[in-house]
Amino acid sequence: MKTIIEPFRIKSVEPIRMTTREERARLLEAAGFNLFKLHSDDVIIDLLTDSGTSAMSAAQWGAVMTGDESYAGAPSFYRFEAAVKDLMDFTHIIPAHQGRAAEHLLFSLIAKTGDLIPSNTHFDTTRGNIEAMGAEALDLPIAEGRVPSLDHPFKGNMDLAALERVLTEEGGRIPAVMMTITNNAGGGQPVSLENIRGAARLAKAHGKAFYIDGCRFAENAWFIKLREEGQKDRSIKEIVRETFALADGMTMSAKKDAFANIGGWLALNNDALAERARTLLIQTEGFPTYGGLAGRDLDAIAQGLKEIIDEDYLRYRVRTNAYIAERLDAMGVPVVKPAGGHAVFIDARAFLPHIPPLEYPGQALTCAMYETGGIRACEIGTVMFGRKPDGTEAPGAMDLVRLAMPRRVYTQSHADYVVEVLEDVAATKDTLKGLRIVKEPPMMRHFTAAFERL
C-alpha cells in the first residue's frame, strides 16, 4: 500500500485544551517570549522536544508494574543491563537519570580546563557539560551539513579530514572524540556507518578514546539501512551492534530512542574509568544499580529498547517527518533537506531574511507559531549557540526551528494542522520582528532567557 499508517492502536488518550489567539499572545508575553516557560496545558501541539515525551506502550506500562525498588541489586537493573547489552555490548552499563547526567559523569572524569573535544556537532547539554569543565567543544560537520537546502544522504557526518588535522595539530589537548547520532543540532541528520568507522579509526590511530552520543541510534540505523551501500539487507539490530562496537563508550538519553519518560546511561569499556564513574555516581545520582531512577523506569527502558528497533515503527516515524517537510517545502517554507529522523527543521534565517541573526529569527518564528496556532517548537540557532564561553556573541552556524515529533503521540491530522499553521505564519512573515535578550544565565541560556520584541 502507498499509505504508511501509524503501526499502533490508541489505548489511552489525553485531552488537548484549545486556546484562542488572544490568550496565547498574553501567555507568550508573560513568558518573556521564551516557550520553555509556557505551561504545557496552554500548548495545542507540543513539538518542543521528542525527549521524554513519547507515548509508552501497553507492554512498557506492564513492565512498570514489575519494577523492583530495592536500593541495591534490584532485578530491574539486571533486566535493564541485559537489554542495553543486547544492542550495545559495552563492559560497564551505568544508569543515570537522563542523558545530561551521563554526560556530566563522563566529562567530569575525562575533561579539564584547556582541553578540546571534537564532534560532528555537539548538542546543547553536551556542549554545556564540556564547557563547565573549562574545555572547548569543537564542531566538525561536513560542509554539506551547513547548507540547509542541500540534499545529502548523510549530512550528519563528521569532516574526517578536519578531524585528522585537529588530532595532529592539537592532539595534546584532546582527551576523546565524540560522535552524535543522529546529528540533532545539524537538523536531525544521520551519520553513515562508513563515517563512524573512519572517526573511530582516526581516534584510535591518535590514541584517543571514541565515544558516541547515541540518543537517536535506532533512527540513525534506519537511515543507514535505507541509504548506505551494502546495508539494506541487514537488520536494525545488526547495524546498531556494529555501530557501538566501534566505540569505547557512549552516553544515552533513554528519553529518546527507548520510549521512556526518564532515564539514561553511561556505557564504558575501560575498567578504571568505570570504577571512577560509579564512585561519582554514588555522590551525585545514586547507587550504581539504580543511578537516580526508580526500578519501574529501568524496566520501562528495557522494554522500550526491544520496541525501538521495530522496522514498521521506524518506517512510520521517519515518514511522518518527511511528510511534513515535503508539504512545507511545496508551499515555499525553507526546510533542512532531507527531513531529519526525529524532527522537521525550518531554516528561519532563509524564511525571515529581514531579521538579522543577532535579532534571533528562529526565536521570532517559534513565537509566531505559538501565537498563531498554539504550536510550541524549539529554536536551534543563535539563541542556543551564539553566546561564546568568553561572553561575546556571534551568529550561530545556522538559525533553525526544530519541530520535534514525540514518538507515537500525534496522528496525521495533527501533522496537517502544523502545516496549516505555518501556512498562516508564512502569509504574514514579512511583518514579524526580531527580539532582544533582556535577561540570561551564563550557560545554556535558551532554557531560561527572557526576551522582548523589537
Swiss-Prot record:
EC number(s) from the headed UniProt entry: 4.1.99.1
Cite the NCBIfam families for this sequence. PRK13238.1
Name of the protein in its database record: Tryptophanase
Give the species this sequence originates from. Answer: Hyphomonas neptunium (strain ATCC 15444)
According to UniProt, this protein's pathway is: Amino-acid degradation; L-tryptophan degradation via pyruvate pathway; indole and pyruvate from L-tryptophan: step 1/1
Cofactor(s) required for function per UniProt: pyridoxal 5'-phosphate
PANTHER family, per database record: BETA-ELIMINATING LYASE-LIKE PROTEIN-RELATED, TRYPTOPHANASE
What Gene Ontology molecular-function terms does this entry list?
tryptophanase activity
Q: Which UniProt keywords apply?
A: Lyase, Pyridoxal phosphate, Tryptophan catabolism
Family statement: Belongs to the beta-eliminating lyase family.
Query: Where does the record place the modification N6-(pyridoxal phosphate)lysine?
Result: 256
Which reactions fall under this protein's catalytic activity? L-tryptophan + H2O = indole + pyruvate + NH4(+)
| Superkingdom classification of source | Bacteria
In terms of HAMAP family, this protein maps to: Tryptophanase
The subunit field of the Swiss-Prot or TrEMBL record says: Homotetramer.
